Each structure stands twice: as C-alpha cells, then as structure tokens.
Design a protein with these regions (language model features):
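Signature of Gram-negative outer-membrane beta-barrel scaffolds
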Residues: 134, 159-263
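Outer-membrane beta-barrel domain signature, strongest for Gram-negative TonB-dependent receptors
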Residues: 1-170
Length: 263
C-alpha cells in the first residue's frame, strides 16, 4: 500500500532556563529556546496526462447525471453503461475504482520517451523518459531561536516593579522538491495551467532564469525562498496598593521586522 499524501512533522523543541535570586527583593528568571526541524507534505502532480485521482469529478457517478430536472427530481443519466459501471465500483469498494492506480502511472512514465530542447537558455537537449506523473514534496524547514527574561522587584511593602524582555529570530526555508519521478528520468519545470490558459511556453516557465529546467529526484524546483521574522520587546509594570488606594502603570515597546528572500 502507498499514499500520495504523506505529512512528516519533526520539530524538536529545546529549552534552557535559569532562575536568579539576586536578593530577597529581586528575582530574575531567564529562558532560551530553540526549534529546529522540518514540515513535509507530499502530493501527486502530473503533466500531459489524465487526472489520476479516483475522486476526480469526471470519475464519479454524479458526472453522468444531467443537471436538467434537478429542481423537479427528474434528472436523467447521460451514459447509462458508464454510470452503472462506476457506481458498482464505488458501492463494492473496488480498488480499481476507489484507489490510485500506481502501476498505470509508472507505465505511463516508462513509455514516455521524450526529447526536451532548449534547456537552460541554451541549445542543449535531453532525451529520456519524461515523467507524466510525479510525487512532489512541499517543505518548510524552520529555525527559531528566542530569549526571554522576567524580573520582579519588591520596592517596599506597598509597591512592586515587574519588567522583562523578549527577543526571537525566526527563519524558515520554503521550497518544493522532487520526491519521486515514479520510474521516469526527469521532469520539466513548467506550469501546466499557464500553458493551458495562454498556449505560450514562455509564460509557463516557473524559472525564468533557467528555461525548461530539468528536474531530477531530490532537486528543488517551482519555488525556493526564505522567510525572516525578528521580534524584540521590552515591558515594565509598576503597581501600588495601600489601604484603599490601588494604582497600576505599564509600558511596552516592541519591534517586528520581516522580509522574504527569494531565490
């Protein structure tokens, strides 16, 4: 058995704490943390081939039911034999109807001998088994480091001062990589939807600096960028409580900077 969609989430969390009792009136607690790992999601993709998903709307019994008569309940079946065959397959839980046909995808890739010209803005070409079906992987690899410190000062029996700071640095690598060519030799990095809508190969290129980019297993393609987020915060509160008089004063200042570094 095999799944087209797999999720792998592995992000270990490390913390280091320190408690400092400076005096009877002043205590400070500090913490450092780090998160390093990855989140991975796989998915099927295809080009120049039929949709392999068994629940694609054209493969369901409802596709063969006419919209006419919907309000009156007098709908008609356009293709009785196809409708009945698919309906029987779903009702009997036939794996040929309800599951992905991996053998068919492998066979389609094996038989697709193709010559790709004009690779990387050059006159070079490549002949091999061009994959029609692939398993691609969407990755988010975070690196998150932070520090915070909190203190409490007992000024006297009526008043206290609380203060602290937070600082964090976050960077995540976001990219798509080739997980499995399903028996093929390479994949060409173009957008099939743009090619369909505009019928212009130049508008379908995902990488304008590398026309007709050839992708092999474990290669990064489609998109590749880093997200950076840096945060800093300072705060303090003063409280006073005596008899029937109670007061509170607080101040907070913070900065957040973020940017995207595309590749």
């Amino acid at each position: 058995k095999r799944n087209a969609r797999n999720r792998d989430n592995h992000k270990p969390y490390m913390t280091l704490g320190h408690y400092w009792k400076f005096s009877e009136k002043l205590n400070i607690q500090s913490n450092f943390y780090a998160i390093v790992g990855k989140t991975s999601n796989t998915n099927l993709n295809w080009f120049g081939a039929n949709d392999p998903r068994p629940d694609y709307y054209k493969y369901l019994p409802s596709y063969f039911i006419s919209d006419q008569g919907t309000l009156t309940g007098n709908q008609t079946i356009t293709e009785q034999s196809d409708y009945q065959q698919i309906l029987d397959g779903w009702q009997s839980n036939d794996p040929n109807t309800t599951q992905l046909n991996w053998d068919l995808m492998y066979q389609g890739n094996y038989n697709n001998l193709y010559t790709q010209n004009n690779i990387g803005n050059t006159q070079s070409s490549l002949t091999g088994k061009r994959s029609k079906y692939i398993v691609e992987e969407y990755r988010l690899d975070p690196r998150h480091y932070g520090f915070n410190s909190f203190g409490k000062l007992n000024i006297n029996e009526y008043s206290d001062l609380n203060f602290g700071l937070n600082a964090s640095i976050y960077k995540s690598k976001n990219y798509r990589k080739m997980n499995d060519l399903l028996g093929g030799d390479f994949w060409v990095d173009i957008d099939p939807f743009a090619l369909r809508d505009f019928n212009d190969p130049s508008l379908a290129q995902n990488d304008l600096q590398n026309i007709n980019n050839i992708v092999r297993e474990e290669d990064i393609f489609g998109y590749n960028y880093d997200i950076h987020v840096n945060k800093n915060e300072l705060f303090g509160t003063y409280s006073y409580n005596k008899n029937r008089i109670e007061s509170f004063f607080g101040i907070n200042t913070s900065t957040t900077t973020f940017w995207r570094n595309g590749k």
